[in-house]
Amino acid sequence: MNRKKNLRLTGAIALVSVAVTLAGCGRDDESSGGARGGSAGITDSTVTLGITTPLSGATAGPGTCTVAGIKAYFGGVNAAGGVKFGDGKTRKVEMKALDDAYDPQKAKSNYDQLKGSVFAMTAGLGTPTNRAFREAAISDEVPQVLVMTGDPIFSDTSESPEQLGFVPTYINEGEAFGKLLVASGQPHKVAILSQNDDYGEGYVEGFKKAIAGASNIQVAKELTYEATDTSVDAQITQLAGTGADVMFNAMSITPLAIASLQKAQQLDWKPSWFLPSNTSSPKAILEPGKASAYPGVYSVSFSKAPQSPAFAGDQDVTTFLSDLKQYADYPDPPAFPHCMWSYMIGATLQEVFQNMEEPTRESFMESLRNVSDLQAPLMLEGTAVNTTEDGQPAVSTVIVQKYNGKGYETAENFG
């Protein structure tokens, strides 16, 4: 398999709290668990990472995937002996993952519980949940990195010195689809439904940036919903009344995404759809939403999709699925892309560990911000991990794709 910088394509460790025998002596100003002269959560033989993510509730599917993917990656790495760090020590990677049910208060509580025993927080899903402890992590100088939120604040070093996002920003995604639509040269009327928070606002901002000044694109109507809403039928009904031929649906809640697709069909409104990368799963959303009824469903991606015929037999995908089954007890092809994303996060962390010269959070952050053109496993051609550009997450390039009834394929044009 083609990999850069000799990363192992294999998987992880414990899903929830792991009992760890700590070695070495912690510094007086650090919590227990530090290596000699190092930071909390790292010894001469182990490094412990913390994750707070939804493992129950409406976003449990994606949240469970955030743990499974990184667990799968480091499972294989640990089985092979661990990661050789830049300080010459070989360490195994352990994790403590707690359920926040997509509740910001629970996420903050989880962070407070974990911060004294982990080296860094990573991979957690959600904008409101990650925001809930961002300021505390800065104050405590605990890295909160490679998190699954497209909120650009996590990639701005002046505002978030201890943070870095992993997935493309919401603005990146919305702009990519807008550019494709403008490039069609055909007139399009667009209906917009967005989540009434930073998530939805980011997608709409990127989309409007791309269509600014384009004479062929008209926004017919724009509505919002709350992340706590249990139905968006009223909004879909209003938007259907516009007769728009494109539906831009900036939605993060899986049940609502399915219901939106279903409701539009009940109203006999069949526009082309745009869905965000985290709510565009063929198996979990498009199939139950009967998305094949629409002339086109578009999303963006930077990862290979195991269900797609285009990647049947792909070595990255084959190894990934094997690791998921063996090390994460996840036997089926994942319904959510978060499994692939967190697998990539594992590979990125391995690269960072290999280049950090001291067992400290400071050395970790320095190494983290110097990853360039890393071809992590499962990345689509044309994408890479690059952490050197301030204001951008680790992955900032996306490929617009179109649903073909089974999976996605690259959309060269709209239509």
Go through the PLM ranges and name each one.
Residues 5, 32-37, 61-68, 83-157, ...:
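Beta-alpha junction/loop-to-helix N-cap segments that form part of ligand/metal-binding clefts
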Residues 21-24:
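C-terminal motif of bacterial Sec signal peptides marking the signal peptidase cleavage site
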Residues 34-45, 50-73, 98-104, 126, ...:
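Extracytoplasmic "Venus flytrap"
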Residues 105, 118-223, 274-299:
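Extracytoplasmic ligand/sensor domains, especially the bilobed periplasmic-binding protein
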Residues 232, 344-415:
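Extracellular/periplasmic bilobal clamshell ligand-binding domains
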